[in-house]
Amino acid sequence: MPKRLDINTILVIGSGPIVIGQAAEFDYSGTQACQSLKEEGYKVILVNSNPATIMTDTATADKVYIEPLTLEFVSRIIRKERPDAILPTLGGQTGLNMAVELAKSGVLEECGVEILGTKLSAIEQAEDRDLFRTLMQDLNEPTPPSEIIHNLDEAYGFVNEIGYPVIVRPAFTLGGTGGGICHNEEELIEIVTSGLKHSPVTQCLLEKSIAGCKEIEYEVMRDSNDNAIVVCNMENIDPVGVHTGDSIVVAPSQTLSDREYQMLRNTSLRIIRALGIEGGCNVQLALDPYSFQYYVIEVNPRVSRSSALASKATGYPIAKLAAKIAVGLTLDEIVNPVTQKTYACFEPALDYVVSKIPRWPFDKFESANRTLGTQMKATGEVMSIGRNLEESLLKAVRSLELGIYHLELDHLKELDKETMKKRIIKADDERLFIVAEAIRQGVTKEEINEWCEMDFFFLQKVENIVNMEREVKANVGNMEVLQTAKEMGFSDHYIAAAWNKTEREIYDMRKENNMTPVFKMVDTCAAEFESATPYYYSTYADENESIVTDRKSVVVLGSGPIRIGQGVEFDYATVHSVWAIKEAGYEAIIINNNPETVSTDFSISDKLYFEPLTIEDVMHIIDLEKPEGVIVQFGGQTAINLAAKLEEHGVKILGTSLEDLDRAEDRDKFEAALTKLGIPQPVGKTATTVEQAVAIAEEIGYPVLVRPSYVLGGRAMEIVYRQEELLHYMKNAVKVHADHPVLIDRYMVGKEIEVDAISDGENVFIPGIMEHIERAGVHSGDSIGVYPPQSLSEKLKEQIIEHTIALGKGLNIVGLLNIQFVVFKDQVYVIEVNPRASRTVPFLSKITGVPMANVATKVILGQNLVEQGYGTGYHPEEKEVYVKAPVFSFAKLRSVDTTLGPEMKSTGEVMGKDLTLEKALYKGLVASGINIPTHGSVIITVADKDKEEAMEIAKRFHEIGYNLLATAGTAQSLAEQNIPVQVVNKIDSEEYNLLDIIRQGKAQFVINTLTKGKQPARDGFRIRRESVENGVACLTSLDTTRAILRVLESMTFSAHSMKEITQTKRHEVVHA
């Protein structure tokens, strides 16, 4: 069937900010879809609220709207642009929910807009638990015994009939939000209440737990002609009970017999056909390991996290083809872009094993509950490819960037059998490592299988790795053993430790013995047809398939998995750098290991290597390709951390030299550079012992800001107000010694300013200056950023520009630099300089029209700023106001404190733009998920140090008609200022108290700055968590509160009696 000619304009709905459960995979799928539709000649309009993506670049669609993904704003765009159709199935759960909302509101019918791809009825049938269960019954497909419930009484009824454990699955939610497994009544009350609250239709499915079954996924495609294929089938190493986004997944499935594979394949195709899905779809199934009994768990009627993984695992571009199917093309008409010979109706075949391991944020949130269940907690994931499962798994482990090079963690060696048993049964992020440790300690596979029902096949693979460890240790220097270990994926780092040598010595030993890996191609067809894709993985085998050309090449290091502090912004910079390298006439080679991102789409670079970002794996590629050099400044801290080791291997680092990188990162060298340039900075010193730290803090005076050197995302950074807090930090947050000093600065309570600039060593160009709403002390990634600055005097702006130019030249920066300043008592101080791409690069690039990563790359390759038409100075400011607001995933991470501080906690960002600050802030806050009602109640509980400041805020809330609620201490302060307030009981009161008000939704905002104790059980922590669990905006910074007040005041009409107005005027005359 040819493509449709009755439609011209298509609106694509993006997925919004990155949150746990919905990460960079939708930037990848959305970008592919927009390009795919443009290829077919359609006019594409895109709406998305996330400025950090390639998808929201102006080149991706014909028109790009970076606006909140709410009914109000999307309807406005539809009425203005009048598209013929919308495509919502590439925007994750956000896109689907938006489509349902638009249809129900009547706006699609009013404007004559059709939904493309999967029909609305199919979306609802797959997403609505009741409709889906009915369809499965009609198809005679087994689902676990279940019941749809809308309240707790119905839940009790089901449990009384079926017994515990039961799984709670809320309808229309993302990443299992609000769901979980209930083993008793207490858990049932908590999880069902939470699930009903998070479901937009107040509906949950309660089902008998089938935890322990194998979890299998099929990624399927279907077109309007009813052609349907399986793109990839995948198997979770963790049995049912752990969310698939938190499971270690392998592809293709490893433990299914042919009969089981065909049975589940047929089921998946039968379901996609019955639903009438047109495009990509993900089917999740549970298989009893001891019989052929299976159950259908759920269907995602859209492109998902799993489809991004399946696309990268097979090379088959699901999103690209789903977009073509949406406009009427069929699988037998679409040429497979990988082979460029076969058609898209050929099912991919794999001659390798792919492993995916999730990347969790627990290194950031040590107090978080690490237990894994049906609610997703991972922020990102890594993927690796090998010729056997052992190799594939070990490559994935060292891709995680946790400083781990093998399936072993030192701190687990102390665990006794009972503790290991408990943790293996319960499942947390370290389960696979504990399984390996248990096998090392002599626990049998049978016992482990009994504890967690992990398949014997996977346990055998872990045992193979453990047995090989013993071989390696028993045969020091044996080349045959080394060869076997390398074939199994062992790293040089592990072997070096076992043989008491350096990693470099093992590397040299291998090279002398011609023991190097070859590179194989990912081609969708198991080498049956010739492939046109330059997409490779390493393995120890015979034939090398990566042909080196005679063109000059440049390697760009990617940024690895998405995690807090290093998000999709770095992938954005990486992709733009690759494009610039190609424009400059070089061959662009990228090394990365994140299956969710645009940078690992094989069509972006000239060559893509899907490999761990370790010195060993990167050097294998450099040894083969012999590039002109390596660019490290776009891959975040991941790439910067490799620079020194690469230079030791004789590799040329392009752009800012290693010496100058070190000068910006090393505290003493940086201080010396600032002193030489005459640029002030907060008083600070470096401590290498606890005693030194205490002495320095006494000398410069509390409060102090403490942090380790060389960090990203403010990891282990804290503001401490007294000695006991400092001692707690030194003991628990960092391991301080001569190689890892701790930096201690005077903490200045001032306005924070952030600048991104490009330097060629002679000229320094500044695209933009941003002002943070929150004062210094809140991490820049968690602050609301405003461009252009709204409250900076021209004099201060000139100082900032002068300092930036001086730093760019003085530090010999070639490429990008990011500087954070604090304005304190009308003086500008430098807090830090990052000689690399920052997370504000996409935001500023989009606003100013300066493609910063592209310009910086060309500078790195030798084209100076003047030749590119820029030169030195500050780019003229835009007229509109732009706001970058952070987005948090606290609802997914139980027992994490939501207080903002110098350690970064946000997972994503949104942008709001308008003619005034108030309007831009409104859009930014609404897009980030904060509801801004014009009236209601606000609970105020603040620390003593904030009481004076809180009075002015309380008064302003009262002025616009809000009710004020406060506990006794704060209430008394308000009453003394004649501000009406209702006293509420503290949280330890037996009677109706503050937490009850939050639980019952009787407060719209909670302002809480209670001193954060080191024990999370403190009152403030409980208030903040209760707010998050109940979807109430909890403001822990008075600066953020003021920003919200500005918005509320601009939305609210004043209501003053004439007498009040007259009195005010008379007062002004008297004081004139």
Swiss-Prot record:
Region (Carboxyphosphate synthetic domain): 1-401
UniProt domain ATP-grasp: residue ranges: 133-327, 671-861
Keywords, in A-Z order: Amino-acid biosynthesis, Arginine biosynthesis, ATP-binding, Ligase, Magnesium, Manganese, Metal-binding, Nucleotide-binding, Pyrimidine biosynthesis, Repeat
Residues the record lists as binding ATP 2: R707, R746, E752, G777, V778, H779, S780, Q820, E832
Residue sites binding Mn(2+) 1 per the record: Q284, E298
Source superkingdom: Bacteria
SMART domains with a match to the protein in the record: CPSase_L_D3, GARS_A, MGS
Domain MGS-like, chain residue ranges per copy: 930-1072
GO biological process: 'de novo' UMP biosynthetic process; glutamine metabolic process; L-arginine biosynthetic process
Task performed by this protein: Large subunit of the glutamine-dependent carbamoyl phosphate synthetase (CPSase). CPSase catalyzes the formation of carbamoyl phosphate from the ammonia moiety of glutamine, carbonate, and phosphate donated by ATP, constituting the first step of 2 biosynthetic pathways, one leading to arginine and/or urea and the other to pyrimidine nucleotides.
Oligomeric form and interacting partners: Composed of two chains; the small (or glutamine) chain promotes the hydrolysis of glutamine to ammonia, which is used by the large (or ammonia) chain to synthesize carbamoyl phosphate. Tetramer of heterodimers (alpha,beta)4.
Stated name of the protein: Carbamoyl phosphate synthase large chain
Organism of this sequence: Bacillus cereus (strain AH187)
Species classification: Bacteria, Bacillati, Bacillota, Bacilli, Bacillales
